[in-house]
């Protein structure tokens, strides 16, 4: 189902895997050889990076950052996102942007379970329309947007720019790409992974750094009895398609 959430990788550290590999090798060199960065090749990356990450030396991942644009998620979702504090965020302001909605589902995220109940869906939409009407009426009567926004439900869609280093991104994906994560933040997490997979320069790091849910990172499901039936196999197969095609 299309929930109207869009994620785009808009920028990342130049030569990200070379940067991370070079930083790893610096640990073993007697001299400070900055010139060697310019000579880093794909062969050097393939020879050293998987091995170093395999040892668990993940601090080197902090030298590469990725910036994503996320649009159409709810503020329920963005509240979960910003709990990951080792990242940078810039979110669309409800104080300076006047909301001018034309359609309820374009303005608010409605869970699929609600959509499957026609009677309940009608009540939801009615309440959402009422909140929009009161918001617009408040602004028209001279109330500041920063006050009028109080009437809007958490379901209102938002836009947010997120920058994470690769190590924090791995932590984020470990928690939020899991099937037990809330469905909306899980969708965002997998869309971020898909954006990385589309990039030839970045794709190898998915496998080498095990960017994905914790079951992929650990080799077992840490949820124990809470693991959804069939999740282990289903998630593993989905993850492998990111770099195997």
From Swiss-Prot:
Record keywords: FAD, Flavoprotein, Methyltransferase, NADP, Nucleotide biosynthesis, Transferase
Keyword Transferase part of the UniProt annotation: yes
Signal peptide: none
Cofactor(s) needed: FAD
Binding site for FAD: 59, 83-85, 91, 165-167, 171
Cysteines engaged in disulfide bonds, as pairs: none
Pfam families per the UniProt record, alphabetical: Thy1
PROSITE patterns: THYX
GO molecular function, one term: flavin adenine dinucleotide binding
GO biological process terms, semicolon-separated: dTMP biosynthetic process; dTTP biosynthetic process; methylation
Active site per database record: 176 (involved in ionization of n3 of dump, leading to its activation)
Domain ThyX as annotated: residue spans: 5-210
Known pathway: Pyrimidine metabolism; dTTP biosynthesis
Placement of sequence motif ThyX motif: 83-93
The keyword Flavoprotein belongs to this UniProt entry's keyword annotation: yes
Enzyme Commission code: 2.1.1.148
Catalytic activity: dUMP + (6R)-5,10-methylene-5,6,7,8-tetrahydrofolate + NADPH + H(+) = dTMP + (6S)-5,6,7,8-tetrahydrofolate + NADP(+)
Binding locations of dUMP: 80-83, 91-95, 149, 176
Cofactor binding, note field: Binds 4 FAD per tetramer. Each FAD binding site is formed by three monomers.
HAMAP family xrefs: ThyX
Functional summary from the UniProt entry: Catalyzes the reductive methylation of 2'-deoxyuridine-5'-monophosphate (dUMP) to 2'-deoxythymidine-5'-monophosphate (dTMP) while utilizing 5,10-methylenetetrahydrofolate (mTHF) as the methyl donor, and NADPH and FADH(2) as the reductant.
Protein family: Belongs to the thymidylate synthase ThyX family.
Subunit relationships: Homotetramer.
The protein's name: Flavin-dependent thymidylate synthase
Annotated organism of origin: Thermococcus kodakarensis (strain ATCC BAA-918 / JCM 12380 / KOD1)
Name of the encoding gene: thyX
